[in-house]
């Protein structure tokens, strides 16, 4: 992790609020309140929708303006009236702004996640875009497959348990359900594409428990810059070591699987039993960490530098590792969530990259895990001639600052770039990127480049299913 300087956050102000006609689902009706904010900010630095009071926030349209960022949220006429009354009663601009922001952040959005697993009753719910409502899923002979795919779709990787429960007459979100066409169910495909509305005569619905992920027992310091990480603050981070020497980072995604980068496994690093995974420590020394053995390494067979060393294309730089024994999770060892199906990285979104990489380009590895917070840069900017001149493909994204100074570096490869979001009313971290490549470290207009994990969800899923009992080094093409 290369760090030249610390970039501090700027103060945000809320100068005005304006109303317009708009509805992201029905453009012929409804209203919105658009809260436009102005703030001093670093290039490419943005703001994301967050939750307040645990509500799920989705598709709060963010558009950059000349003075700041516009945060859009949907209101019905009744809600608008309620907010207006609230604003008048509060009588102070500061209190009024607080009310609008609170209401915006509590409004549940349904564009990003089509599937919900309710943590209160464990019922599976799928969004019906035609009726603009959530439906429970009627029990069927496809319950186990559907439950497993559902967990994957929301980024939870694996199913822990599923069951069937009865709902009373008039239950099931107004008595409406989805039934499933079993022949259309498939890993890597959204389950809503196999659903149709039904009455569910059995009155039995599917409930399930997915592997928990993306949660931390210990918070990290909210500092923008490269700093020593706290023990337990990034519990999915691992050190991949070959013959006892740190080579790359990786991310725990389940009790048996690690995600890393394909380029970590060049020809001279392909004797699988010489690899070890160090977990649960901010130090990259075995004496301070749990050590796991590797059974299988699967890398993407279309990672072109492995096909021809003269090819300068780092697309599909991804690999997964299977462990010989399942991990026991604790406060220092936890899996990170994968992106949900259809989830996209957002230009300007802040993320965190962690690793033990070089603290200088020609320097030495860090002894303590480093963390740095950097914004995602748009593909358009990153492909500009003075950046990477069209080398950024759809399977990558860039993150960093125009002036450089903070970046991943040698030794960080394969490690996580995570972003925080809220799903099912719980704040979680998702593995948005894998440290892949870059020109130098922390150079101006040469940000870090990351494998875009959302593009490889079907590949990861297939690799875990097909190679869980296949020891050795394996390669698998796209699915």
Q: What is the predicted function of each stretch?
A:
Residues 2-479:
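Extracellular "complement/coagulation-type" protease architecture
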């Amino acid at each position: 992790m290369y760090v030249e300087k610390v970039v501090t956050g700027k103060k945000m102000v809320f100068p005005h609020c304006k109303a317009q006609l708009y509805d992201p689902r029905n453009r012929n009706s409804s209203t919105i309140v658009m809260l436009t904010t102005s703030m001093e900010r670093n290039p490419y630095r943005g703001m994301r929708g967050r939750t307040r009071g645990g509500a799920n926030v989705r598709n709060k349209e963010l558009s950059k303006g000349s003075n700041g960022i516009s945060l859009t949220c949907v209101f019905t006429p009744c809600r608008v009236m309620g907010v207006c009354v609230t604003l008048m009663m509060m009588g102070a601009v500061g209190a009024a702004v607080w009310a609008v922001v609170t209401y915006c952040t509590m409004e549940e959005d349904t564009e990003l996640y089509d599937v919900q697993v309710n943590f209160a009753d464990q019922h599976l719910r799928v969004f019906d875009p035609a009726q603009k409502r959530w439906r429970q899923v009627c029990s069927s002979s496809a319950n186990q497959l559907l439950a497993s795919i559902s967990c994957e779709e929301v980024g939870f990787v694996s199913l822990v348990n599923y069951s069937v429960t009865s709902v009373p007459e008039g239950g099931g979100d107004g008595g409406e359900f989805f039934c499933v066409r079993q022949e259309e169910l498939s890993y890597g495909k959204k389950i809503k594409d196999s659903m149709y509305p039904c009455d569910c005569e059995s009155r039995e619905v599917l409930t399930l428990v997915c592997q928990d992920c993306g949660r931390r027992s210990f918070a990290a310091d909210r500092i923008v810059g490269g700093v020593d990480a706290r023990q337990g603050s990034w519990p999915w981070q691992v050190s991949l070591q070959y013959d006892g020497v740190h080579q790359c980072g990786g991310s725990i995604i389940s009790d048996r699987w690690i995600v890393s980068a394909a380029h970590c496994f060049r020809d001279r690093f392909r004797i699988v039993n010489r690899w070890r995974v160090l977990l649960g420590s901010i130090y990259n020394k075995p004496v301070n960490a749990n050590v796991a053995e590797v059974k299988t390494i699967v890398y993407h067979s279309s990672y072109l530098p492995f096909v021809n060393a003269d090819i300068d294309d780092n697309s599909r730089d991804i690999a997964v590792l299977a462990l010989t024994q399942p991990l026991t999770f604790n406060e220092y060892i936890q899996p990170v969530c994968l992106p949900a199906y259809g989830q996209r990285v957002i230009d300007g979104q802040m993320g965190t990259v962690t690793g033990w990489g070089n603290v200088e380009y020609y320097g030495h590895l860090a002894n303590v895990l480093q963390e740095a917070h950097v914004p995602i840069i748009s593909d358009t900017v990153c492909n500009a001639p003075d950046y990477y001149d069209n080398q950024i493909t759809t399977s990558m994204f860039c993150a960093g600052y125009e002036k450089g100074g903070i970046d991943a570096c040698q030794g960080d490869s394969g490690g996580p770039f995570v972003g925080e979001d809220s799903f099912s009313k719980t704040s979680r971290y998702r593995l948005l990127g894998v440290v892949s490549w870059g020109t130098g470290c922390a150079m101006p207009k040469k940000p870090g480049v990351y494998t875009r994990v959302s593009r490889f969800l079907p590949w990861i899923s297939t690799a875990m299913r097909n190679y869980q009992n296949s020891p050795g080094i394996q390669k698998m093409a796209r699915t």
